[in-house]
Each structure stands twice: as structure tokens, then as C-alpha cells.
Amino acid sequence: MKLEYNRIIDSTLVKADTLPHEIDTLCADAHKYQFFAVCVNPSYVSYAKNILKNTAVQLCCVVGFPLGQTTQKQKVYEAKIAIKEGADEIDMVMNIAEFKKRCACVITEIRAVKKVCGKRKLKVIIETALLTNDEIKDAVNVCIDGNADYVKTSTGFSFRGASLEDVQIMNNAAANLIKIKASGGIKTAKQFIDLFQAGASRIGTSNAVQIMQELKKMNHEYH
């Protein structure tokens, strides 16, 4: 049986000028293609939840986004509100500056947000574009120590998004102790398949429909 690629997609819309009708389309497409989740900014959680309430599509919300430069208390509060308004998953940005200082507070912060999430999945964005290869490995281990469910490549707001090398490094460091989400600049079916084969078990993209249409032409199975 072929993999159902649609079931590893987080269809994403987190740009600053997002309008309600764009969220309508995001959610309608997610239901049509049966994507695993949609990912939105905090201001659209309750709006998107109302649209998705009779579907199987999960709702993901970003926290500390896109810079990660909010405090632990702020990230915890933001996650609490998002969950209260209907978020099923949280994608949180790691404090990259504190990580580079090797501060143990980064692990404490991840654990604090995971405690709020409970059984809901927590994905931690490490912004690989700003890290060396060794720092990427260390960041994966920090996320493992923080009890995160996923380590995620990128916000999509830095100078580049996910690369194949990033995911390969993350996959080797993860050692099956944490899952990997690739995101940022994923626009083609080839990128999608390459990143999946490199070890990403969830892929975030703002080009989900186009990718599914390309996959169909390539005769990959999907719903």
C-alpha cells in the first residue's frame, strides 16, 4: 500500500496580512484533500476551529512566532489561550539566542509549554538557517530533553527554509526519539518527497494543494 502523502501535511497560512476568506479556503482545501492539519496564527484559531469542527482536520497554532523572542511565561500563556480556543497542536519557536548561549532555560521553556499541551503534540521550531550543523544536532537533543514531540526546521521567515541536509542531520540526531517536521520554502512535489525520504514525518507548506496536484500527476496515491 502506498503512503497517503496528504496525511503528513500541515497546510500552513501564517503570513501577516492573512484575511478571513483565505482561512476559509485553507480549511476547505484541507477538508477536501484530507490534510492532517492546518497551521495558523493565534488570532485565527477560534475562527478556523469553527470551520473545521465537523471535519477530521487538526488545528495547529504557532507560539512565540516567528522570532522565538518572547519569555517562557508569554509562550506558556499563548499556548494556553490557543488550546482553550481549539488548537490541537502547538508549533513553538525555540529561543535561538538563549540556545546559542547554551542556557538550560531553553529546555525548561520547552518542558513548560509541553506541560500545557499535555497529550497534544508540541513541535519546536529551531530555525536551522541560523544554526551550524553541530548546533542543529544539539538543538534536536534539547528538544528531546524538553519532551517535545517534534523538532521542526523553520518558520519560513528567515533567509531560507528547510534543506535536505538539515533534515538528514536532524534525522540522524533524533535516533527515533523525536519526530521531524520540515517546513519553509517547500513548494514542489520533488522537495516534498525528498524531505519525507530524508526523515520528515510531517511537512508544513503553504503550497499544499499544488503539491498534491503534482503528486497526482506523478501517480502517487492520495485521497
UniProtKB/Swiss-Prot annotation:
One GO cellular component term noted in the UniProt record for this chain: cytoplasm
Coiled-coil regions listed: none
CDD domains: DeoC (cd00959)
Keywords assigned by UniProt, alphabetized: Cytoplasm, Lyase, Schiff base
One example of a Gene Ontology biological process annotation: 2-deoxyribose 1-phosphate catabolic process
Protein's pathway: Carbohydrate degradation; 2-deoxy-D-ribose 1-phosphate degradation; D-glyceraldehyde 3-phosphate and acetaldehyde from 2-deoxy-alpha-D-ribose 1-phosphate: step 2/2
Keyword Iron found: no
Membrane-spanning ranges: none
SUPFAM superfamilies in the record: Aldolase
Catalytic activity annotation: 2-deoxy-D-ribose 5-phosphate = D-glyceraldehyde 3-phosphate + acetaldehyde
General function of this protein: Catalyzes a reversible aldol reaction between acetaldehyde and D-glyceraldehyde 3-phosphate to generate 2-deoxy-D-ribose 5-phosphate.
Name by which UniProt lists this protein: Deoxyribose-phosphate aldolase
Species per Swiss-Prot/TrEMBL record: Mycoplasma genitalium (strain ATCC 33530 / DSM 19775 / NCTC 10195 / G37)
